[in-house]
């Protein structure tokens, strides 16, 4: 046998062996995996159906509410759309099962028998032809050896058998290669059909979702507007945390009205006896004071301002933006340093330099405040750096440099020096000139010792209240109350008409000057490496 024919034979047998031992087992495994994929998809489809039915029920509940009807409609539409897409996907899976898996499973069983028969037939035919050719060649060799006259005809017959054998092995190899290619083409064409079905499904899904998703997004963003929120919930931001018991934080209007003396400094409140019963001397002294002292304007205490300014809004657990909403007692006023325009954003607040804005949020959100322009109904966001806090303390018309603090008209007269502590004077003898009382030297010395140590104005609220002063004996209080009531009232009235001078003689006018830190930028500094 010629070596080339033997090579064709081995190549053809390798193709049949590859189809039987590699391709068909791989196709059987692919059918098994495809069936697992179908079972997983059916389980996924059932779970998706249950999930989107639950979403639809929640949307129907939102439709019955008074605040979330738009959101409920969005949820119902989303559920219907997803279930419709799920049904379309089931069509794709049916195509995958009917046009791919079933054909592969059926063709695999038939193909295994067909390839076995083809290989057996080729092997038998090849052996038969090879045997005939071998027999003819042996006869030709004997006839040539005997010099037979029929040797010429036998040689032609051997050449013909050899050509037929060569054509047979070539045709058999091409047939085997074609069968191998046909099987790979079958697998590729079936999955191409599946890919085309997926492409059609995703095209329909894109056309269905593209416009609806944009509409749902616009409606969802529109529901974030504070004007649409009828009650504090998911869409309405709440300013200030609730109390641990669940009730809302009371505002300044809901708080009980306090006495006028409670708006003074902590030291003056201790001295005026705000933690105990009011002595009879204090009541008599308050009756002797003029009417304009009783009708002093009531200013909010620094402690209430501090507590209201330290409120916190609730956490953004649902991605809510901080909205505007005026709290009862947490609003503060600021003055604009520069002008601010809203531009194309209608949520910003427009104001000019010098305008007063009422801040409606307890603290800045990323450097932005939300407030309302005083004297108008416009409100919006504005940068925190554009404004500065507005001093709400009243100014003494006789001396604009010294603010007037609230005084309790019902406080004892023997504690008059404590009322005057809101005036940050530079020396102690100026106050002694105003109220030179022989019986109150201890209180005044204690006060000026504390003033020299603190060097801070008394109208600034203190975090920790100072300890109460040691009460005077009852006999001393009664004597002081009976002897010095009228004189103290006269001195206080004359002091209000003619306030003390800003820098009395003998004091240091630069004692409270604070120097601003400077930076040395000269080149004489050493170069450190």
UniProtKB/Swiss-Prot annotation:
InterPro entries: AH/BAR_dom_sf, Baiap2l2_I-BAR_dom, I-BAR_dom, IRSp53/IRTKS/Pinkbar, Pinkbar_SH3, SH3-like_dom_sf, SH3_domain. Signal peptide: none annotated. GO terms for molecular function: lipid binding. Gene3D superfamilies: Arfaptin homology (AH) domain/BAR domain, SH3 Domains. It is found in: Cell membrane; Cell junction; Cytoplasmic vesicle membrane. Residues 329-392 form the SH3 domain. Residues 1-239 form the IMD domain. The keyword ATP-binding does not apply. Residues 321-331 have a biased composition (Gly residues). Pfam families: IMD, SH3_9. Residues 439-459 have a biased composition (Polar residues). SMART domains: SH3. GO terms for biological process: actin crosslink formation; actin filament bundle assembly; plasma membrane organization; positive regulation of actin filament polymerization. The IMD domain consisting of an antiparallel dimer of three-helix bundles, featuring on one side a positively charged. The N-terminal alpha-helix inserts into the lipid bilayer. Also forms homodimers and homooligomers. The residue Trp-141 is essential for oligomer formation. Phosphoinositides-binding protein that induces the formation of planar or gently curved membrane structures. Binds to phosphoinositides, including to phosphatidylinositol 4,5-bisphosphate (PtdIns(4,5)P2) headgroups. There seems to be no clear preference for a specific phosphoinositide. This is BAR/IMD domain-containing adapter protein 2-like 2. It comes from Bos taurus (Bovine).
């Amino acid at each position: 046998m010629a070596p080339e024919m033997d090579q064709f034979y081995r190549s053809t047998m390798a193709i049949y062996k590859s189809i039987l031992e590699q391709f068909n087992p791989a196709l059987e495994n692919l059918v098994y995996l495809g069936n697992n994929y179908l079972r997983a998809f059916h389980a996924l489809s059932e779970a998706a159906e249950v999930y989107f039915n639950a979403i639809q029920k929640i949307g129907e509940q939102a439709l019955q509410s008074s605040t979330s009807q738009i959101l409920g409609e969005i949820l119902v539409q989303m559920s219907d759309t997803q279930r419709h897409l799920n049904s379309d996907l089931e069509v794709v899976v049916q195509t995958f099962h009917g046009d791919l898996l079933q054909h592969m499973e059926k063709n695999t069983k038939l193909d295994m028998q067909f390839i076995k028969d083809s290989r057996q037939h080729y092997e038998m035919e090849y052996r038969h032809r090879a045997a005939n050719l071998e027999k003819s060649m042996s006869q030709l060799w004997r006839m040539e050896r005997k010099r037979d006259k029929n040797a010429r005809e036998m040689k032609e017959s051997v050449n013909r058998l050899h050509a037929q054998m060569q054509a047979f092995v070539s045709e058999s190899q091409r047939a085997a290669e074609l069968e191998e290619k046909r099987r790979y083409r079958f697998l590729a064409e079936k999955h191409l059909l599946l890919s085309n079905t997926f492409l059609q499904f995703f095209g329909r899904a894109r056309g269905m979702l593209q416009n609806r998703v944009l509409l749902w997004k616009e409606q969802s963003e529109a529901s974030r507007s504070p004007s649409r929120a009828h009650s504090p919930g998911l869409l309405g931001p709440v300013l200030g945390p609730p109390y641990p018991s669940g009730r809302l934080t009371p505002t300044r209007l809901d708080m009980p009205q306090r006495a006028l003396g409670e708006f003074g400094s902590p030291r003056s409140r201790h001295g005026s006896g705000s933690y105990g019963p009011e002595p009879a001397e204090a009541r008599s002294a308050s009756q002797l004071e003029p009417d304009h002292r009783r009708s002093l304007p009531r200013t909010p205490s620094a402690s209430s301002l501090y507590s209201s300014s330290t409120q916190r809004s609730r956490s953004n657990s649902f991605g809510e933006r901080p909205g505007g909403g005026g709290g009862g007692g947490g609003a503060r006023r600021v003055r604009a340093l520069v002008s601010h325009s809203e531009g194309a954003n209608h949520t910003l607040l427009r104001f000019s330099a010098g305008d007063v804005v009422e801040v409606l949020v307890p603290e800045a959100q990323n450097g932005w405040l939300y407030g309302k322009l005083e004297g108008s109904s416009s409100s919006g966001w504005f940068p925190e750096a554009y404004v500065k806090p507005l001093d709400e303390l009243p100014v003494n018309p006789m001396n604009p440099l010294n603010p007037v603090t609230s005084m309790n008209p019902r406080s004892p007269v023997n504690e008059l020096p404590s009322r005057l502590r809101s005036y940050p004077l530079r020396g102690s003898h100026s106050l002694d000139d105003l109220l030179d009382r022989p019986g109150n030297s201890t209180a005044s010395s204690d006060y000026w010792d504390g003033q020299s140590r603190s060097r801070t104005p008394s109208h600034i609220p203190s975090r920790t209240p100072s300890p109460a002063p040691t009460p005077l004996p009852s006999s001393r209080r009664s004597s002081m109350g009976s002897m010095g009531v009228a004189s103290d009232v006269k001195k206080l009235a004359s002091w209000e008409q003619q306030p003390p001078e800003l820098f009395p003689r003998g004091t240091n006018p630069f004692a409270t000057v604070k120097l601003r830190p400077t930076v040395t930028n000269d080149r004489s500094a050493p170069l450190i490496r």
